[in-house]
A protein has these predicted regions:
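Short, hydrophobic alpha-helical segments
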Residues: 140-155
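Mobile beta-alpha loop/short-helix "lid" or hinge segments that flank ligand
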Residues: 5-12, 103-123
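Helix-loop-strand module that forms the ligand-binding subsite of alpha/beta enzymes
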Residues: 27-114
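A short, charged, Gly/Pro-tolerant segment at domain boundaries
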Residues: 155-174
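Residues forming the flavin
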Residues: 123-133, 140
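Conserved small/polar residues in nucleotide/adenosyl-binding loops
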Residues: 176-179
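N-terminal beta-loop-helix "entrance" segment that forms/cooperates
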Residues: 7-25
């Protein structure tokens, strides 16, 4: 288990340049490329964020956009979990926002007894949220169980069969109408 803080780092957002498809990593050579190597080796990923305006920390979103877009290893059956912390509101929207990275990547999402949120504004305040702390303990047990179960399933049955992706673009690629 390793804890990596990204919210206070200088991480650029994705510019959709496509270099990651050519070189296998993001054109911006920063901690995102290092995280991709660690993520590839991991069985699971927990992403946590404070809630700002019913959304996750912007630096974290830039990191996740680039991490998930530029890393081309198979994320299928790596377990994901998101955890959010707010003074009051916005937890559900932020929780949903973070889980989208997992679900679009074929990653099972670990759940708890409630949405994975805890409340507090200042450091230490979340210690007073008894239900939130219980939710986190339950999440840890459930995620551990899910990772172990998936590992046993891989050994006994292998991974589910996959199909080649069938991408759909709702906008025609022809730009001749602009000339």
């Amino acid at each position: 288990t390793e804890i990596i803080l990204v919210g206070n780092k200088d991480i650029r957002g994705c510019i959709a340049c496509g270099t990651c498809y050519e070189k296998g990593k993001c054109v911006f050579n920063d901690m995102v490329n290092e995280l991709a190597l660690k993520f590839e080796e991991a069985d699971g990923l927990v992403v946590a964020s404070p809630v700002y305006y019913a959304s996750a920390n912007a630096t974290l979103i830039a990191c996740l956009d680039r991490l998930f877009y530029s890393s081309h290893f198979d994320k299928t059956m790596k377990v994901g979990a998101s955890v959010v912390c707010a003074r009051r509101g916005g937890c559900s929207a932020t929780f949903d926002e973070l889980n989208k990275y997992f679900t679009i990547s074929g990653m099972p999402v670990a759940s708890s007894q409630y949405w994975n949120s805890i409340h507090g504004r200042m450091p230490g305040e979340s210690e007073q949220d008894g239900e939130g702390k219980q939710t986190m303990r339950t999440l840890a047990r459930n995620m551990t169980f899910l990772m172990k179960s998936i590992q046993l399933g891989k050994e006994k049955f292998g991974l589910p069969e996959t199909e080649p992706k069938t991408p759909t673009n709702f906008i025609p690629v022809s730009y001749t109408h602009l000339t």
